[in-house]
Amino acid sequence: MLFMAVLTGCRDDNGGKLTFEMLEAGKSVRLSNEERSPLCSVSLKMASATKESGKIGEKINAEVVYRLFNQEGIGLEGAMEQYVEQYCSSYRAHMLPLYNEDRSDTTKRQWYEFHYIINSTTEQTSPNTLAYLATVDYSEGHANSIHQLLPINFYTTTGDYIRNSDIFVDGYETQLNPLLLKALMEREEVNTLDSLKEKGYLQTVDIYSPENYIVGDNTITFIYNPSEIASLEQGTIEIVLTYAQMKKFIKPAFLKSLQ
């Protein structure tokens, strides 16, 4: 279902207007026919490049479908509707037999309460780049919802997805990881790794270069979703590094492409 008109826009390389509209798909189903049966709710509200955005918009939508739904050869609206139906069908098929065994135990009802939500928007992050920002929140019987920010970076000039290999030289992690650790320490106002651990960071994992980041005009914002490098209570962690800080392992061609 088409939900809202133009969301945002920017110029493409041919002087055209790259515009987005909001699409919505959703459904709620009860696990059984009982009035107080556990519920599964799916809600997808997603930015979609319009037809007026041409081939560039088509490439962006196709990449979003692949990244978020692992599908190819289907439009975004169709992928959304298909995902909603499959998620709800899978919920009933897999959870109903288990629920029937636990039906008499009301303390276990929450184990069967499911929800899956995606909200997305777009942001022009430099003259030639766009970030597609998908926020995913889901719970499959957990006490706490799982929350994720999943950015997808694009060139507005071509619609191409920006990959790690477009930005960084080979072996960049060995130089980036120490910078990320240093920035995290500065953010938390500590001087040692032990002090970071005392604050709930890096207790079970070493610092690493995350797959999630937002390409900006002068910076990259690296994103760690809840529980990735810190306790759940810390929430989403963002570390911002400038291109000047990363100049030893950033490809010059990438920096030029931002101009």
Label the model's feature ranges.
Residues 10-259:
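Compositionally biased intrinsically disordered regions enriched in Thr/Gly
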Residues 1-8:
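Sec-dependent bacterial lipoprotein signal peptides
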